Amino acid sequence: MTKRTLGGTNRKRKRVSGFRVRMRSHTGRRVIRTRRKRGRARLAA
């Protein structure tokens, strides 16, 4: 049996699509705004 290698890394996930990263750019802020408007429970990763 082979191992499942696509585990996912929390550090990378936060660095790429975390809240603070989103707030840095204009388009990232737009993402947060849209998700707030839709009433998402989680705005960012």
Curated annotation (Swiss-Prot):
GO terms for biological process: translation. Gene3D superfamilies: 1.10.287.3980. One of its GO terms (molecular function) is structural constituent of ribosome. One of its GO terms (cellular component) is ribonucleoprotein complex. Keywords: Ribonucleoprotein, Ribosomal protein. Belongs to the bacterial ribosomal protein bL34 family. This is Large ribosomal subunit protein bL34. It comes from Synechococcus sp. (strain CC9605). The gene is rpmH.
